[in-house]
Structures are given as structure tokens and as C-alpha cells.
């Protein structure tokens, strides 16, 4: 997630709420939600493919930014990370280099928008995030293409 999201470590109540959301999304049937570092400021919510776990971080909470990713609720954020895990289980290996990492992020947000228990506002934010990620991919791919031609 982006730095325009929350950076303050989560309280025990917020962590418990996220654990309940994870169960609601049926994430516990896919992989473990690791909460041990979520109380640390600046911690990141992310799927770790090597360990097949989602780490809960401070940035699971929305921030003050105007971008859809900044405004995503805990449900949308966790659904996005769960979709990375589900896609990994389907055999989709995540790219780590630009520009393709942007497409992976777009696909994860679109996939997450179809998960059960994701409401309309969250769905819109996830779709808007996917659009933004595709635009970032287009810019990065064009830059890479221009560099290769030089």
C-alpha cells in the first residue's frame, strides 16, 4: 500500500477488527494473517509469496490522500492482499519488476473487487485503484520502451 495511508501502529482493538475482517473475507482458508508487527508505526500490509502469509501493517487503515488506494477501507485493503494470495494459489507468479508489477497490482485490485463481503464503495475504490495501476504501467512501459530505443 502507499505511504498516504495510515502510518500509526494499530491498537489491539484495530488488530482484532482486522482479524475478524480476515475471517469474514474467508482469508483464513487461504493463508495466515500475521499480526505481530501491526502495532509498529510504518508497518506495511503485504502478501509474502515465499511464506504464503499476509502481514498486517499500520497501513491497513486509510489515510488522508485523494487516490482510491489511500481511501480504501480495511476490508478493501485486506481483500486486495487476499487476492494476491488467491492468485498465487492459482499458480500466478507475481512479477516484481516494473512495469509488470503495476499490472499485478491492477489484477489484484480487480480480483478483490469481486470477493464476497466487499461493498460498493470498496469495490469502486478497488476498480479505481486498478485503473490507476494500469495508467502507471502504461507510463512505465512507454519509458522502458523509449530507453530501449536509445
Stretches found by the model and what they are:
Residues 1-40, 145, 149:
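A metal-dependent hydrolase signature that marks the N-terminal structural subdomain at the beginning
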Residues 6-11, 65-68, 97-99:
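Second-shell loop/turn segments in exported
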Residues 34-75, 85-89:
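Active-site scaffold of zinc-dependent metalloenzymes
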Residues 73, 77, 103, 107-111:
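Extracytoplasmic/secreted proteins, especially bacterial periplasmic and envelope-associated proteins
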Residues 82-99:
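Catalytic Zn2+-binding segment of zinc metalloproteases
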Residues 85, 89, 111-118:
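Active-site catalytic microenvironments for nucleophilic, acid-base chemistry
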Residues 101, 113-150:
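Long, well-structured alpha-helical subdomains associated
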Amino acid at each position: 500500500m502507499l505511504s498516504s495511508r495510515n502510518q500509526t501502529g494499530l491498537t489491539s482493538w484495530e488488530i482484532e477488527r482486522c482479524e475478524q475482517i480476515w475471517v469474514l473475507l474467508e482469508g483464513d482458508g487461504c493463508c495466515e494473517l500475521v499480526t505481530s508487527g501491526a502495532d509498529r508505526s510504518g508497518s506495511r500490509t503485504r502478501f509474502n509469496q515465499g511464506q504464503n502469509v499476509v502481514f498486517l501493517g499500520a497501513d491497513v487503515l486509510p489515510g488522508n490522500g485523494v487516490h482510491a488506494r489511500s481511501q480504501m477501507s480495511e476490508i478493501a485493503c485486506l481483500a486486495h492482499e487476499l487476492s494476491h494470495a488467491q492468485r498465487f494459489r492459482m499458480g500466478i507468479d507475481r512479477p516484481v519488476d516494473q512495469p509488470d508489477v503495476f499490472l499485478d497490482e491492477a489484477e489484484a485490485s480487480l480480483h478483490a473487487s469481486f470477493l464476497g463481503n466487499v461493498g460498493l464503495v470498496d469495490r469502486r475504490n478497488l476498480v479505481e485503484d486498478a485503473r490507476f495501476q494500469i495508467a502507471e504501467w502504461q507510463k512505465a512501459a512507454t519509458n522502458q520502451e523509449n530507453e530501449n530505443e536509445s
